[in-house]
Amino acid sequence: MFYVADRTEMQEIDRLTIEEKGVPGILLMERAAITVLEEINSRLKSINADRKLKCLVVVEGGNNGGDGLALARLLYQQGDIVHVCYINGISRVSDSFSYQLEIAKKIGIQVTDHIIDSDYDVVVDGIFGVGPKRDVA
C-alpha cells in the first residue's frame, strides 16, 4: 500500500519544489508530461509499438492546461494523431499555458474550441489537475 497526497498537499509539494528547490514550474510540467506519456505507451503500445494512437487532449488556460499541452506535444512528436480542444473557461491564462500553446501551434498540433471526433484511443483531462476548486456541471 502507498500514500497518495491530497490536493492541498500536492499544491504544497509543487510550491516547495518551485520556491525552495528552484525547479521552474515549466520543468515540472515537462516531467509530468513525460511520466504520463510513459504510462500511455506502457499500456497502449506495449503490444504494437508502431501503432499510432488517436488522442484528444482537453485543456483550459491554466497550468493544468499547460500540462495537457506538453503531453499533446510529446504524443505528436512520437507520431500519434493529436487533437487539442481548448475550452476557454477561465479569465486568466497562465504564462506556462501560453508558452505551451505557442509551441503546440508552431509544430502543427490542431487546436480547436470543439471536439472534432468521437473515436479516440486516449482522452486526456488538462482541466482539473489535483482537484477542482469549483463545482463540475
Descriptions of predicted regions:
Residues 1-52:
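Positively charged, low-complexity intrinsically disordered leader regions
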Residues 2-5, 45-137:
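Glycine-rich phosphate/dinucleotide-binding loop and adjoining beta-alpha-beta core of small-molecule
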